[in-house]
């Protein structure tokens, strides 16, 4: 189940999206209930995007948290927005009988965690992974004719912070050609 609740009193385009899902596998130990809520809030130049979800069953106890706070800079020609973010995907503790790794079986998995396809921080099928803790800073800038430049810095580690996966710098140029077509070119340093 999914609800889309507009919060126009906060700002145009603001909404929350609570959801409930019951996922069933043939093997009972992989089935779980998921409860969560996404929020996309805009107030003047301040932007907030967040999500929290829990997966729960007899053996599964996992969660995810995503917080992004941004500033939309309408008064500058060259700067579009600045955003700081934190993503925490719970990881499994092999010392317990419970499965604590959050499964992104139905989600974007690695899509929002930088561009580099680094194996250690993109494996979120199932519940036995180390999880992820990501800090990021992003700036979107007007660049050349009708193009945008995204500069993003990411810091990745396991959920418990014991395994450092590394840092990433993204430089991405995007140009909208029409309503149906855009091009994207980028460099990624890991």
Language-model segments: what does each one mean?
Residues 1, 31-35, 42-44, 61-65, ...:
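Residues that define the transmembrane beta-barrel architecture of outer-membrane proteins
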Residues 24-31, 55-61, 129, 159-165:
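Solvent-exposed loop/turn segments connecting transmembrane beta-strands
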Residues 20-26, 43, 52-56, 73, ...:
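Transmembrane beta-strands of outer-membrane beta-barrel pores
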Residues 47, 51-52, 60-142, 148-150:
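Extracellular/periplasmic loop regions
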Residues 8-17, 45-49, 76-82, 145-151, ...:
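Repeated loop/turn-to-beta-strand initiation elements of outer-membrane beta-barrel proteins
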Residues 1-50:
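Internal metal/ion-chelating core segments
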Residues 134-190:
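C-terminal amphipathic "assembly/sorting" segment characterized by alternating charged
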Residues 3-11, 41-43, 54, 71-75, ...:
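Residue-level signature of outer-membrane beta-barrel architecture
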């Amino acid at each position: 189940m999914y609800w889309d609740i507009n919060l126009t009193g906060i700002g145009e385009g603001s909404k929350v999206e609570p959801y409930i899902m019951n996922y069933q596998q043939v093997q009972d130990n992989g089935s779980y209930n998921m409860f969560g809520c996404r929020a996309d809030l805009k107030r003047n130049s301040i932007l907030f995007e967040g999500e929290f979800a829990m997966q729960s069953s007899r053996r599964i106890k996992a969660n995810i948290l995503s917080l992004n706070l941004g500033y939309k800079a309408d008064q500058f020609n060259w700067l579009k927005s600045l955003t700081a973010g934190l993503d925490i995907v719970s990881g499994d503790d092999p010392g317990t009988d419970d499965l604590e790794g959050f499964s992104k079986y139905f989600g974007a998995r690695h899509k929002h965690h930088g561009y580099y396809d680094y194996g250690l921080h993109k494996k979120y099928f199932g519940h036995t992974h180390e999880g992820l803790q990501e800090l990021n800073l992003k700036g979107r800038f007007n660049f050349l004719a009708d193009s945008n430049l995204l500069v993003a810095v990411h810091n990745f580690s396991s959920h418990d912070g014991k395994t450092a996966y590394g840092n990433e710098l993204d430089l991405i140029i995007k140009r909208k050609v029409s309503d149906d077509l855009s091009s994207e070119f980028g460099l990624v340093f890991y």
